[in-house]
């Protein structure tokens, strides 16, 4: 009987060690998942910031085109955004989420709509764990945000005529002959910005 207890103790110690290692390994995977989630949140925020900056630029271009009697309706397609401040906007949002933008905000196209793709890397690491090397590992993530026009333009509309736009149910009236800046709604009414699926 005494010898049976002596044989059980090493098995108990061995099983306890395995359970502890499994718990630490699970914690390491949880740390890595948390870092990945943080990186993805930073990438999403950076991509949205880049696209929103370009959307604001579209509104500025629309106003300028009206002032110079150009075909301002072209700006409502969303294709004319140059995204001059897109990278700076993406960098700022990445930094606010404790990450660094890798490269810049890269113009892209998704289903015919303009957008911006970004890549970020977390400034923090996964942290120390039972898995070697995690203390120096950073999480990386990518995201793409799209600018999508929200307004329907009729086929008989011209840049010199008064226009009634249906922007996802919100009616916007623009008369280029009697135009004031206050006539324009917020850029979010004319263009939606969302993450690419």
What residue spans do the PLM features occupy?
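Short amphipathic secondary-structure patches
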Residues: 52-126
């Amino acid at each position: 009987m005494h010898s049976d207890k002596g044989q059980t103790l090493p098995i108990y110690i061995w099983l306890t060690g395995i359970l502890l290692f499994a718990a630490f390994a699970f914690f390491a995977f949880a740390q890595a998942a948390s870092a990945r989630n943080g990186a993805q949140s930073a990438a999403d925020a950076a991509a949205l910031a880049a696209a929103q900056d370009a959307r604001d630029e579209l509104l500025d271009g629309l106003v300028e085109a009206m002032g110079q009697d150009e075909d301002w309706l072209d700006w409502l397609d969303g294709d004319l955004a140059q995204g001059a401040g897109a990278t700076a906007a993406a960098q700022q949002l990445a930094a606010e989420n404790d990450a660094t933008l890798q490269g810049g905000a890269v113009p892209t196209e998704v289903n015919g709509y303009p957008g911006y793709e970004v890549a970020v890397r977390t400034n923090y690491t996964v942290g120390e764990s039972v898995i070697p090397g995690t203390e120096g590992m950073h999480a990386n993530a990518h995201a793409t945000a799209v600018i999508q026009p929200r307004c329907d333009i009729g086929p008989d509309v011209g840049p010199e005529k008064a226009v009634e736009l249906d922007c996802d149910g919100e009616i916007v009236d623009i008369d280029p002959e009697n135009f004031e800046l206050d006539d324009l709604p917020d850029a979010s009414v004319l263009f939606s910005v969302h993450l690419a699926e």
